[in-house]
């Protein structure tokens, strides 16, 4: 997407920092990061196009993130370090703005008209 340079750089920086810290702190602590997708903090249940665009068929909620954080803090994740875990319902695996559900990308080209 155009005009997302700062967002993209920040996301990349988090991933790189996670990897570097996992190496630097190896043997003392495990370091992982979580990159959430669309998370509704009002616990509203979205239907229609909002949910349909998600490969899992729903918008995420805070418990999706909390459950991963709890897992990463547990011994069950004892062999996981240096990972950036994407919790986005599969959105990073598909094109968001494909217009199947009426979603379009506003390029901003006509803003001065």
Q: Locations of the language-model features?
A:
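Active-site loop of short-chain dehydrogenase/reductase
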Residues: 2, 27-29, 83
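Catalytic tyrosine of NAD(P)H-dependent dehydrogenase/reductases that use a Tyr as the general acid/base
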Residues: 7, 15
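A glycine/serine/threonine-rich, flexible loop-to-helix segment
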Residues: 3, 33-55, 94-113
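Active-site helix of classical SDR
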Residues: 10, 18
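Generic leucine side-chain signal with a strong bias for well-ordered alpha-helical environments
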Residues: 17, 25, 68-72
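Alpha-helical segment proximal to the catalytic Tyr-Lys
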Residues: 23-27, 78
